Amino acid sequence: WGLYAIPGGEWKGKVYNGAAEWLKSWAKVPAADWLELMKQWNPVKFDARQWARMAKEMGVKYVKITTKHHEGFCLWPSQYSQYTVAQTPYRKDILGELVKAYNDEGIDVHFYFSVMDWSHPDYRYEITSKEDSIAFSRFLTFTDHQLKELATRYPTVKDFWFDGTWDASIKKNGWWTA
């Protein structure tokens, strides 16, 4: 769940078939245009308790919640990014609401976390220069901070599932394999 839910698979009248969460990349949407979607993010009908009750009724034992997808939009008020739900009209900590609701129903919570982050200025698809290396090092520090923040803020979460790790910058970096 992220800003990509607002346009779905359509941008400026063109429909992009496939996963809506890839729209920013496929449509080559400029960062400033994509950030404008934050002004619209306001899921006022969202009810974490209702989701958790329905999951329990269906016999669900665990859920995997997207903390942020490749677009970098955080569903928690991260102190390391301004690209979060806290900067939207909704303002509430969606992850916190979901974790509490599912835990209250006895359902284990696991987190999905995209290492790739299209919104971060220091993210690099590959490292081709010393400047890239320095920038990517800053990005890895940012990522470490976000992961520690999530683990500390939501201590009942059982594990993390990492996505977006196929770029050369990540594959060739010892940070990821450490």
Task: Name each region found by the language model.
Residues 1-178:
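Mature catalytic domains of secreted/periplasmic carbohydrate-active enzymes
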